[in-house]
């Protein structure tokens, strides 16, 4: 509980909670999704908060995680004016579904679905973040496959890239397919499962 008090004390009034940017400049929040791990950290915060709540019934950390997820949901999405980015290192996708399971707040499910649907679309979001690499003709340095962002997830049939990132993504995809009845996402999950296990 003491550690949770410390974490929650760092949370900003707007709900943002990543101490690197709180300390080093909030003007850089969500400007390097590919390499920096804000959404990854948010995902682990949510996972820990949900597990702690389920084990103890205490909701202080859960409320903090939900506020950070609300901050992200206000920033990312398909709506005009929102950022069309997605996590460079996946876990937020599956964590947001767990947060939805506990709170019943549909915006968390929608944000997870947005991250999954947006991944791999062209033009690549990471190109926008790193125009200097694109200008030099070094798009390969952005390593889309490493982040499972080389093509839309429904078109992926081979597990590639960083294995932990991949399985976090595939778990989130399976959760969304289960929750929404999305048959095309379910079919992609089956192909990726076969790629991993056969």
Name each model feature, range by range:
Residues 1-198:
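Glycan-recognition and catalytic cores of secretory/periplasmic carbohydrate-active enzymes
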